[in-house]
Every structure is written in structure tokens, then in C-alpha cells.
Amino acid sequence: MEGEHVLICVAWPYANGPLHLGHVAGCYLPPDIQYRFERAMGNKVLMVSGSDEHGTPITVTAETQGITPQQVVDQYHAINKEALIALGCGWANTLDGRGPEYGGALFNRTSDGEHKRMVQENFSALEVGGFFERKTTEQYYEVNSDGTGRFLPDRYVEGTCPVCAAEGARGDQCDACGATYEAVELKDPVSKMNPSARIEIRETDHLFYRLDLFQKVLEQHANSQQGIWKSNVKSMTKNWLDMGLQPRAVTRDLEWGIPVPLDGDDWSGKCVYVWFE
């Protein structure tokens, strides 16, 4: 009997620091066990993961260390891949020893040219299909004493969570309570990299993914999985759907990342939001 085709999708951690035991226990050891089991069963299995090399986690680390974002991701991609292989995870052999038709274990990078092509291709298709809407939003903007400045997306701004009042919340989410919100809802905002800088609110245009268009179909899918999903997954999904899905921004005022594949000066200096990527 010919083996089944199995795809194992593993989380992609940011390449902004060394992995720790939590990464191994939480997202690398379980899929590696599954990978070995599927191979032992004679299945054709492909396990895919790699380094998430874009977004503010990378640029903030680069600015803190005084090096370029490329140097950050090159350094930690190599360190983390070598560490996983040293632990005995199956990333050493990209192709299965039985032959390429049996799959293998691919530990890739989001800086890979093929990844960029696919992201921009799918982004453009969604835009043409009418799944994006353009909005003028208000964002925090850092103004320096010499008159220069920049927008403060995601980890570039910290403050007090508007939901649970925890300090140290970021511009896109609060790690304490898990809430997501618009950046300007953050209270007592401070620039992460330049705390003494004056912060003001400025307008900037972004594209938003129309998640609300999928409300009904996702409710139907969630209902069909009640006997399959774990209780925490079911409750979390129900909470999101009960609140009503809202459009989410898929672009950022940031140059490190995959450029927005649209014509016009309005999109110059903007990239695809790393979570959407």
C-alpha cells in the first residue's frame, strides 16, 4: 500500500534571538515526533518551518544592537537551526533519505525569494478580488528634536493596555491579556527606541483585510469541528466570532519586510504586515 501524503506545518519564530526550551517543548519537539512517526509508517511527509525574518521584532533588535536587520536574521537563523539539529530534530536532512518523492524537513527563511514572490502574488490576488479596503488611519508618530520623525508601528511604541491596564503593552497587542487594538488606543505611549521623543498622532493610509466577509463561512466551519477541536480552541474561536470579525490592517509603515506590491507613491516605504505575510 502506497504511503499517504502528510504535511506538518510548524511555527516560525522570529530570528531576533536564540531559541529557548519553551520553543523546543511548545512547537518543535511535538512535530518532530510526528514527523518520525509518519516516516516510520512509510508515509510521504514534509515538515516545514523556518525563521520569521521580518517585522518590528527584527528591526528593534537591530537598532538596539547597532547592526542591520539583515545581520540580525543571518546570525540567529544559523544559531537556531544549528541548535535544533544539535538537539536531534530532523532539520539536518532537507530531503528524505528514501528519495525526494518522500518529502523531507525544510527549515527555510521568509527572506527567501520564492517566499517573497508567493506573498506578493497572493496579496495582489486578494486586492484584485476586492478583499482589501483602503482606510486612512491615525497612528503614533515620533518627532525628534532635530525635526526628523517616523511612524511607530507595533513594537516601536509601548504604553498602558487600554483593556487590562497592564504596563509595557505594545502598539499591536498586549501580552498580559492577549488583547489586540488600534495603536492609538494605547495609553501613555512612549517610543521604544527614543523615550524622550515627542509623540503625536498623524494620518496614514493602509489596506485592511475584510475578515467580516468570512464571518458566516467561518461560523459554519467552526460548528462542523465541535467534535474534533480541543476545548480551548473551541472557546477561543467562539469568543472571536461572537465579537464579530473586523477588518485587520495588512500593511505597515516600515521598510524592512516584503514591499506592498502596488503602484503609486502612497505605498512607497510600506511593507506587508508580518502576521499577514
Question: Model-found features: residue ranges?
Answer:
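Cys/His-rich short segments
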Residues: 130-206
